[in-house]
Amino acid sequence: MKFFALFIYRPVATILISLAITLCGILGFRLLPVAPLPQVDFPVIMVSASLPGASPETMASSVATPLERSLGRIAGVNEMTSSSSLGSTRIILEFNFDRDINGAARDVQAAINAAQSLLPSGMPSRPTYRKANPSDAPIMILTLTSDTYSQGELYDFASTQLAQTIAQIDGVGDVDVGGSSLPAVRVDLNPQALFNQGVSLDAVRTAISDANVRKPQGALEDSAHRWQVQTNDELKTAADYQPLIVHYQNGAAVRLGDVATVSDSVQDVRNAGMTNAKPAILLMIRKLPEANIIQTVDSIRARLPELQQTIPAAIDLQIAQDRSPTIRASLEEVEQTLVISVALVILVVFLFLRSGRATLIPAVAVPVSLIGTFAAMYLCGFSLNNLSLMALTIATGFVVDDAIVVLENISRHLEAGMKPLQAALQGSREVGFTVLSMSLSLVAVFLPLLLMGGLPGRLLREFAVTLSVAIGISLAVSLTLTPMMCGWLLKSGKPHQPTRNRGFGRLLVAVQGGYGKSLKWVLKHSRLTGLVVLGTIALSVWLYISIPKTFFPEQDTGVLMGGIQADQSISFQAMRGKLQDFMKIIREDPAVDNVTGFTGGSRVNSGMMFITLKPRDQRHETAQQVIDRLRKKLANEPGANLFLMAVQDIRVGGRQSNASYQYTLLSDDLSALREWEPKIRKALAALPELADVNSDQQDNGAEMDLVYDRDTMSRLGISVQDANNLLNNAFGQRQISTIYQPLNQYKVVMEVDPAYTQDVSALDKMFVINSDGKPIPLAYFAKWQPANAPLSVNHQGLSAASTISFNLPTGRSLSEASEAIDRAMTQLGVPSSVRGSFAGTAQVFQQTMNAQVILILAAIATVYIVLGVLYESYVHPLTILSTLPSAGVGALLALEIFDAPFSLIALIGIMLLIGIVKKNAIMMVDFALEAQRNGNLTPEEAIFQACLLRFRPIMMTTLAALFGALPLVLSGGDGSELRQPLGITIVGGLVMSQLLTLYTTPVVYLFFDRLRLRFSRHSSQPVSE
């Protein structure tokens, strides 16, 4: 009593405390960062190494394996995968959530250093690492185009200046430049001219390397002066290399220009990038795992004007893709939904109270509770994201409940004629324990979420804490500010009486009367009602087992990613044509705003595309509908496939794949893996539950196998090293020298003229100078034949791996796909030497599926313990928890009706329903127990009276929660696919629960009361001797 009086009789202090909470919340709101979702990125580091010209198998065995053995010893590595292709190896290290990425980076560098002595000596540079996940979609893509500058010059500008500057911006993890390569001097050799002049390829390489050196020359000085010695030992341009003497034939000088075409070109001519229909250089910017995407994008945009000033007028710099607009639009939609929810909740209160003064009280309590929560969010290091704002939207119905319960009870005393301050004191004292029970038991629901580990726990933590803080502030407001405002604003007596005799009040009285009559009938037929309770329990279990499930709702972020996979023997020229064809088809779609893409590099038969869709208000289709439409058009392109997927805010794992979900095959027997992977992929592609099935196993590339005749080589004076050097010099784009410039270093690249590499006959023109100085054709000591070879070699851990990727067809869920894959693997009879498991998002889904039931049961158990402690009873908590099955049935039926799978968002809704629907039972049980203790009523009379007396606050709180969630169901626009499952679950559960628990709770209360009396009688009987 003294606690309530302290605030009721000191209105100024109470108002100032509430104002302080509000001001702190406003300050916290202004300081909170903005993000699409809570920070759930795994720390990921990518290690890259190159050895130009080396086959994928050579890269895997000589580069990837030594690095993997060293990197695998690092503590906290969750998963290590690698992919080796032509001349390139990339290793992805995914660390545990609690691992600091900077400390992990230091360990990675130490491991690279330790493995350095085991790596091939011919590597042009040491392995490097980046603190970025290559499988993440770029947060921004910039393009450089020009009608004046060459692609190599644009690439040089992008790589040397723009990428370096952008990489220094806070939050940027990696800037990947694509579409070409650095400028270089290319030496395209003429094999016939070399043979005629008697010059070997190795002699040309040596001559070029010796002619371009950078060494210190020292200085001269006398007693008064000092002169730095400088020579013309460096060659900078193709024109400088052209007259270089590489050999003497019969006393005549053979110059480089006599046996080769020397040009200013690029390091790797097998690269192409495009934006819409124009050649372009792409800067793909990815954020650090722990960085905020909005802040990072804003920082980049703030630097763009400065970067524009450094760009020559003939170069056009454009933003081709930006992830932030749809994120901002989604958050604006949630904020609008929050405002609408607050307005609807206050409208519900007004309809019940029909008094402006009375409505003002919860109208003040709700914003104070919600705004005050922002301060706690800031202190906890949270962000304004879709989940935290949805938590506040749902909290609207919660926080008003406490104020309603207190206000309604005080109003009841005022209508009985009690003075306002006395009514405020008496009313708040009567329901203080009820409000405390409701709030504590609601917060208890979220304790298991706070203890949940892994990605789901990280994802739900902000939601749970935000909602719990809002409920806690609401509890404080309802026991302090609300009674004070009731005591000073409301009046007693007749002014409140007519509210029950007009309009909605008359309707409510009529409904309450009908409820009383029907409740009498239900109490007389309690066995039938008991069967209904048991039926809802069984139905809720069956619905949960049968409903389709997925990890997270498929988002429409307005951005698509596409992976091109062509025939494994395709040439770069043909692949570039495929890229152009695909981009033309996509550009013609009415929903597409911008398309960029690139191909080439170490994977000649693959490419990537990034598609920006028009804003939601300018297109009628969702991202998935656009994909379905494009899929039909793209299927007609022969020799290549383009796999499209919508970019999601959550993507787990570091594997780059052409689809959203992955299933990985592992084996220590590479031949078994290569035998079974095609069979498994074919079986999965036939499943209707899967779409866009593809694999990263590419072991059918065209290869030319050369077999040396070692005896002949020995007789002719030719070593294997001589022969290998010949092939590397001729076909490996060998980097033979370095050109040093003020801002960067460039390479001299040597290979035979492309005109001689169009078919296998080029090998007939190759020759080696033997130890006697005679040219020996390759065909004299080697034979060759076509064969198949892998285009890439993949590892997970230290085992050979192949990842099958897939998307979900429209109307299918991840649970259906997972079950179909498991059935297919069983039917195929895959041997134990080949192990299959889900990876990435699909793996997290499997783990979440196993934890969902435990999580729900843990929440129920926690609520039972809290209620048992509060009521000092084992029985009454069971009565209160009997409301849950009907809510579960309503929620799951609503998801089925709206064709929405059960996702992590729907799980949040179920957890919320556990907290919401028990409030009705708490209000009934509290008043029934009070009536039994102080009113000398029988249990039947007590529960009947409690149901009638609490009917109005029960209806008010339920409708407030329902209307608070209704905007989530009805909302459209950006991000609605996240909001709708939560709203559908809550509204469906509330409707079903309200229809049933008003009748089932009294019956369950009486059942447990009779059970309690029966046990007490048995325990009180004397034991016979």
From Swiss-Prot:
PANTHER family per the UniProt record, alphabetical: MULTIDRUG RESISTANCE PROTEIN MDTC, PTHR32063
Recorded family membership: Belongs to the resistance-nodulation-cell division (RND) (TC 2.A.6) family. MdtC subfamily.
Lineage, highest ranks first: Bacteria, Pseudomonadati, Pseudomonadota, Gammaproteobacteria, Enterobacterales
InterPro entries: AcrB_DN_DC_subdom, Acrflvin-R, Multidrug-R_MdtC
Subcellular location: Cell inner membrane
Native source species: Klebsiella pneumoniae subsp. pneumoniae (strain ATCC 700721 / MGH 78578)
Residues passing through the membrane, by range: 15-35, 333-353, 360-380, 387-407, 431-451, 469-489, 528-548, 851-871, 875-895, 897-917, 953-973, 984-1004
Subunit structure, as described in the record: Part of a tripartite efflux system composed of MdtA, MdtB and MdtC. MdtC forms a heteromultimer with MdtB.
Protein name, UniProt field: Multidrug resistance protein MdtC
